[in-house]
Design a protein with these regions (language model features):
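Sequence/structural signature of outer-membrane beta-barrel proteins
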Residues: 1-2, 54-59, 96-98, 147-151
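Surface-exposed beta-loop-beta
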Residues: 1-36
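Hydrophobic, lipid-facing positions within transmembrane beta-strands of outer-membrane proteins
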Residues: 31-35, 51, 67-73, 124-128, ...
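Residue-level signature of outer-membrane beta-barrel architecture
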Residues: 39, 75-77, 132, 168-170
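Short loop/turn motifs that connect adjacent beta-strands in outer-membrane beta-barrel proteins
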Residues: 43-44, 77-87, 134-137
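Transmembrane beta-barrel strands of outer-membrane/channel proteins
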Residues: 47, 51-53, 71, 87-93, ...
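Outer-membrane beta-barrel "beta-signal"
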Residues: 89, 158-170
Length: 170
């Protein structure tokens, strides 16, 4: 993994945009922590909350998130005579570290983001879904997501995503 500040320093010496691939070290490591809580409020209602943090000094191997806070609620369909159905709503706010912001603003590319024109603002995601049991073990879910400041850029978005999923339980 490469260190963002090392890539910035190298770019200042050589010119051009910072690039973490040029400063990768086999011994580089990263760390972080996360907390998750899920709680049934009743037989039909559940809530969740998650919080995670890492220093954000090195490139990511999975997602470009240094800190995240999310929460939501799900309600089973028993209240409207559809006990196998579920409706849910959730919200997440994600951010990156100051060294990654600087790296991206100077033209660096991360695992999934970067175009050299970062106007940083926290990414905010709203999601809602409805999962319906349509036949025996077949469930169909409709999903909507709205992302404000996608890829941490206030000059982008918001974007809307609509999804349809099928799930079979065996």
């Amino acid at each position: 993994m490469g260190n963002y500040q090392n890539a910035i320093n190298q770019a200042q010496q050589t010119g051009g945009a910072p690039n973490v691939t040029g400063v990768r070290k086999a011994t580089q490591s990263s760390w972080g922590y996360g907390f998750n809580i899920e709680q049934a409020i009743s037989d039909d209602v559940g809530i969740f909350g998650r919080w995670s943090w890492n220093p954000g000094t090195t490139e990511a191997q999975t997602v470009d998130i240094s800190r995240s806070l999310s929460g939501g609620v799900s309600i089973k369909g028993s209240r409207w005579s559809r006990p196998k159905d579920t409706v849910g709503i959730g919200y997440a706010a994600n951010g990156v570290s100051s060294s990654q912001i600087s790296y991206l603003q100077q033209g660096g590319m991360a695992a999934f983001i970067g175009d050299g024109a970062l106007s940083y603002k926290k990414e905010q995601i709203f999601e809602t879904f409805y999962s319906a049991k349509v036949y025996k073990e077949l469930f169909i879910s409709a999903d909507y997501q709205r992302i404000a400041n996608p890829a941490y850029n206030s000059a982008r978005g918001p974007v809307n995503f609509f999804g349809l999923r099928a799930h079979i339980e065996m």
